[in-house]
């Protein structure tokens, strides 16, 4: 399971310079250059999506649910008291793929906002669990990008490239929802709104992130 998760980050590594380039081009590049960068990003996301599906080859649902998940579920409220350390309960969310900077970085570059969905507050909170340099990278891109602003007033070609990039991320998140069902919901026999390892409502979080990604698409204008 963890090998497959690392595989997603490995597949996404070549996109880091693409994100940096697209962010820079959004400030002073041409529409054609920015469209090309977004096209490269969309192509790279195909490999990231394929890497996510490898989890089915590396770990079966029963093994994950019964032998892995109990140890990464975390301990939110009421927390756990560490004897000899503190009398106050320690509260920590469990291991979650949302703690990877990868997808948050992609959202930041494209200007995808999750504030209107429950996913937003959780995604912001888990940044505290990222390695500091990763968190700073996400913050820098989020503050420096003008991609969505440029696309809104850009050419049809640029808008189409942007929407294709969004569609690839949405497809990734849709695949993630299917995995969550097969690896958590189905083995538990529970309703879809059970909590994930991060402590959030699983179905609400995943569907919210997918919806805000899809909703970010821009209707192409008639500009050539």
Model-derived segments and their meaning:
Residues 1-224:
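Surface-exposed peri-terminal alpha-helical interaction modules
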């Amino acid at each position: 399971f963890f090998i497959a998760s690392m595989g997603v980050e490995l597949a996404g590594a070549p996109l880091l310079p693409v994100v940096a380039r697209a962010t820079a081009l959004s400030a002073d590049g041409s529409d054609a250059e920015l469209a090309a960068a977004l096209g490269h990003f969309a192509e790279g996301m195909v490999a990231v999506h394929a890497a996510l599906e490898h989890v089915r080859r590396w770990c079966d649902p029963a093994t994950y649910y019964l032998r892995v998940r109990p140890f990464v579920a975390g301990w939110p409220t009421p927390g756990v008291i560490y004897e000899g350390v503190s009398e106050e309960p320690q509260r920590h969310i469990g291991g979650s793929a949302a703690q990877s900077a990868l997808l948050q970085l992609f959202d930041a570059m494209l200007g995808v906002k999750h504030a209107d969905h429950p996913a937003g507050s959780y995604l912001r909170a888990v940044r505290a669990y990222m390695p500091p340099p990763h968190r700073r990278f996400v913050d820098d891109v989020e503050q420096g990008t003008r991609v969505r602003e440029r696309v809104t007033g850009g050419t049809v070609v640029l808008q189409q490239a942007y929407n294709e990039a969004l569609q690839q991320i949405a497809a990734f998140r849709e695949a993630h929802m299917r995995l969550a069902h097969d690896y958590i919901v189905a083995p538990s026999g529970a309703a879809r709104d059970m909590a994930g390892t991060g402590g959030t409502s699983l179905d609400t979080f995943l569907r919210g992130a997918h919806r805000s990604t899809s909703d970010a698409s821009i209707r192409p204008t008639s500009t050539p």
